[in-house]
UniProtKB/Swiss-Prot annotation:
Family to which the UniProt record says this protein belongs: Belongs to the Mediator complex subunit 31 family.
Main location: nucleus
Quaternary organization: Component of the Mediator complex.
One term of GO molecular function: transcription coregulator activity
InterPro entries documented for this protein: Med31_sf (IPR038089), Mediator_Med31 (IPR008831)
Pfam families per record: Med31
Protein name: Mediator of RNA polymerase II transcription subunit 31
GO biological process annotation, one example: regulation of transcription by RNA polymerase II
Subcellular location: Nucleus
Role, per record: Component of the Mediator complex, a coactivator involved in the regulated transcription of nearly all RNA polymerase II-dependent genes. Mediator functions as a bridge to convey information from gene-specific regulatory proteins to the basal RNA polymerase II transcription machinery. Mediator is recruited to promoters by direct interactions with regulatory proteins and serves as a scaffold for the assembly of a functional preinitiation complex with RNA polymerase II and the general transcription factors.
A GO CC term attached to the entry: core mediator complex
Amino acid sequence: MASPPAQERPDVPLHGGFTRFELELEFVQCLANPVYLNYLATQKYFDKPEFVAYLDYLQYFAEPKYIKFLHHPGPTLRALELLQQERFRQDIITPGLANKLQIEGQRNAVPSQKD
């Protein structure tokens, strides 16, 4: 399923000991955290065209051969989808929206208990 470790593949360049894919995988999974999205917005990352283009590039994780590497594909891909919208990138700067998304995510992660 997974490819051999980078140390066994000398043809794959490393960045700080990790492959580009490993770094992108870790980063894209961070996008599932609404508080992190709020942080990126407050730091003005979403105002940078090159960063927005990078978010678009990361949509390759929605492809079946890559989605299997995501720990939480639903929230990760939903965040990536929302980040393609300029309005969302502007609105996530408000802590209220980040909080609302976090609460919704927690509700969806925990099965509801019935009496």
